[in-house]
Amino acid sequence: MTNPSEGTTPLAFRYTPELANKIEGEWQNYWTDNGTFNAPNPVGDLAPADGKALPEDKLFVQDMFPYPSGAGLHVGHPLGYIATDVFARYNRMLGKNVLHTLGYDAFGLPAEQYAIQTGTHPRTTTMANIENMKRQLGALGLGHDSRRAVATTDPEFYKWTQWIFLQIFNSWFDAEQQKARPISELIPLLESGELKTKDGADYNALGDVEKQKAVDDYRLVYRSNSTVNWCPGLGTVLANEEVTADGRSERGNFPVFRKNLSQWMMRITAYSDRLIDDLELLDWTEKVKSMQRNWIGRSRGAEVDFSAEGETVTVFTTRPDTLFGATYMVLAPEHELVDVLLEKAGSYEGVDARWTNGQASPAEAVAAYRASIAAKSDLERQENKEKTGVFLGVYATNPVNGDQITVFIADYVLTGYGTGAIMAVPAHDERDYEFATVLGLPIKEVVAGGNIEEAAFTESGEAVNSANDNGLDINGLAKDEAIAKTIEWLEEKELGRGTIQYKLRDWLFARQRYWGEPFPIVYDENGQAHALPDSMLPVELPEVEDYKPVSFDPEDADSEPSPPLAKAREWVEVELDLGDGKKKYTRDTNVMPQWAGSSWYQLRYVDPSNDEQFCNIENERYWTGPRPETHGPNDPGGVDLYVGGVEHAVLHLLYARFWHKVLFDLGHVSSKEPYRRLYNQGYIQAFAYTDSRGVYVPADDVEEKDGKFFYQGEEVNQEYGKMGKSLKNAVAPDDICNNFGADTLRVYEMAMGPLDTSRPWATKDVVGAQRFLQRLWRLVVDENTGEVLTRDEVLTDDDNKQLHRTIAGVRDDYTNLRVNTVVAKLIEYVNYLTKTYPDTIPAGAVLPLIVMVSPIAPHIAEELWKKLGHDDTVTYEPFPTFEEKWLTDDEIELPVQVNGKVRGRITVAADASQEQVIEAALADEKVQEQISGKNLIKQIVVPGRMVNLVVK
């Protein structure tokens, strides 16, 4: 083992920023040179060379990895990274084998946009940003196993992203078994007739191309002509999650239009029930669980068939008991039957003008209406604002009473939820009521209890006006019974069926970009998709000069995507042998979305250099497999602690769970879930400043005068906001490390408040953390001579009480990620020692302190540990334990109240009886002064807390 101070000049004796920087650099080199934080695997190239068995007790702690775009980190970014490092270091001291590393999520739109702005290739920009971020993170002293670090842009990594894509592509979801199965197991079921094709055709009677299509209809990855979010300004399609509520791109703020395109989709909806139900297995916050449940949006109800001009229009409703109140129908403007029904539509002659949107015919009205909503996002369409729509010129038949009801299209109905059509019950639905009121449509009460003249009645009540002559009468029934009876009648008459619907939609899995994982898919001359064999992976991005996306006029809704990879003709047009001789193929020119690499990266951390597998299952089982003996019988397995922001609750986390479940179904992993425990850290906030236009100005250039703030002479407004580039209030960690030291930054960020809450940054307060470390240093090192100030001496009882209570509290706080209170307890203990031992100090009092400090301030702890005669790192020193006998007081002090006011204090034995406590209170001189000559009415003892005497 190398020693970081061997061969160096004597250190300065005072703990200054200069000394801190020197110590920190030396110990960081020591950790790197000695592989201090390297965690061994059971098998493979990271297994112990001597064959030594691994500890059964392990910990896999993981951060949500960063996006290496822009100008690097600000002090808000390391908050979670420092916290996980503290937790990992503490657990190493408990004897656990700890896996902690950090990679880079380097593909995707942010990196590409930044590269476009700077005029350099995304790879060049990304690698430079990664190196800068590595430097910044390295300066913080994070205890990462650098051998396990990955970047999603490394071909060695995305080879396996492509491989996992192919596993999903070559799978189908067996609804009966509720799991993914290989496509090879599907074909025999289609051939035998045990499973039907999606369109009901006889599989064996189909030609080869039709058979392939029948199989493709079952795949978990498929191409679909679907309505997507097309952003001409970015030149790509966006997922719903990447579109803001006002219908603009989250990145770049460009208009987004709804457009029908053929796109790769992942059938995440097949896993809706498991994604909801398995949340109960996870140690996640209820907030995140609720967000995922709401995003998936499971609703129980019925599908009901309405007849319209010879066509069947199926609606989904959670309230089939209100069918008698359905007075009109609404289809989403994109519904596939709209154009079919338009061909059968009548004229607008005699039609209410409010229904026509000022147009002469249904066809013209529909075209104009569709154009008017093209730029609206789903969220914008569902906002509570004035309802709009147009009459389709046809009528539908209400199946329960035979009423002819008008059929409209309106933007508040979406194709992605339910069936894209609704039965409108305005008396008992607020949106339907608003629509009916605006357009003058009938409103019929079918649930008693409200006043439909004033508003929709949406609460529960008995059914009224709800009977027909065909065997259905639910009048007088409560909601649940009425629903059940209506569904039973619908199924008996073959007019509907009970069912479950979800808000969740299949995952749009393609982008028209350059900087992403290429698809391992080629197309033959007939346009049929073929998966590439494993031997042809990775499909690497071609080197191209023109990597910029083909962007369009941001307002050009009629533009068509043109992926930049399509320009690389030599790469696109290939001749391959896929098992039946060489043939010409065309590569897919889309790339995967930014979420692909982050959907599985924790598994590559486990086995980062395995060339044969994405992750050896023996290594996966050790690090993430279920441990029912530790975590309970229903433990799903997964990473032991995953720390990151709550903003990823329904994006990354949902996608990662989906991919992991497919891998579990196919037998590639032993864990059912990717992340056993999730912890959402808060944010570091800082003052931000806006000028009279509301534009943010650089916080560093703002001056304060007489309580007001000025930028270039103009008064500006001060506000708090999340630290970042957009608010121009970022503080670089480099500056804090240079001016105070990394340990000071670590202590300050951990002491600012509970980890799961946001906290304000104030550079002027950092000095408080520095002073704490200086006091710690002075306990051990004489600032004048550099001599060590410890001596061999038995601790006093008071010393032992302070030490063991500190150990007990700190252990509990570290275990529960209450690092801010760890710092508070350590400060209290240092203050006690400083006051008690102004000259020299017993080694037995300070050695445990250094170990307790080391997870938070590892560099100074290592240096002091070495000064006290140790040759090895403090990293694996067993964490101090406490003795119970020092946690309880022999004597306690109790306040004594007389008629509710404290009049004295007494000291009694901790186990004193109530009678002994009263006797001591009455004997106290100050208390006697208050009760002398008065009658003692009542005496109350609150054990361990206080004594109250009532006199008169």
From Swiss-Prot:
Asked if Aminoacyl-tRNA synthetase is a keyword of the record, the answer is yes
Residue ranges annotated as motif 'HIGH' region? 66-77
Q: Which UniProt keywords apply?
A: Aminoacyl-tRNA synthetase, ATP-binding, Cytoplasm, Ligase, Nucleotide-binding, Protein biosynthesis
> Which residues does the record give as ATP binding sites?
725
UniProt short sequence motif 'KMSKS' region, positions renumbered to this chain: 722-726
Q: What reactions does this protein catalyze?
A: tRNA(Leu) + L-leucine + ATP = L-leucyl-tRNA(Leu) + AMP + diphosphate
| EC annotation from Swiss-Prot or TrEMBL | 6.1.1.4
List, in alphabetical order, the Gene Ontology terms for molecular function in this entry: aminoacyl-tRNA deacylase activity; ATP binding; leucine-tRNA ligase activity
Question: PROSITE patterns, per this entry?
Answer: AA_TRNA_LIGASE_I
Subcellular location(s) per record: Cytoplasm
Chief site of localization:
cytoplasm
What InterPro entries would the database entry show? aa-tRNA-synth_I_CS, Leu-tRNA-ligase, Leu_tRNA-synth_edit, M/V/L/I-tRNA-synth_anticd-bd, Methionyl/Leucyl_tRNA_Synth, Rossmann-like_a/b/a_fold, tRNAsynth_Ia_anticodon-bd, Val/Leu/Ile-tRNA-synth_edit
Q: What class of enzyme is it?
A: ligase
One BP annotation, GO: leucyl-tRNA aminoacylation
Q: Which SUPFAM superfamilies match?
A: Anticodon-binding domain of a subclass of class I aminoacyl-tRNA synthetases, Nucleotidylyl transferase, ValRS/IleRS/LeuRS editing domain
The record's comment on protein family reads:
Belongs to the class-I aminoacyl-tRNA synthetase family.
Q: Per its record, how is this protein called by name?
A: Leucine--tRNA ligase
Give the originating organism.
Corynebacterium glutamicum (strain ATCC 13032 / DSM 20300 / JCM 1318 / BCRC 11384 / CCUG 27702 / LMG 3730 / NBRC 12168 / NCIMB 10025 / NRRL B-2784 / 534)
Q: What lineage does UniProt assign to this protein's organism?
A: Bacteria, Bacillati, Actinomycetota, Actinomycetes, Mycobacteriales
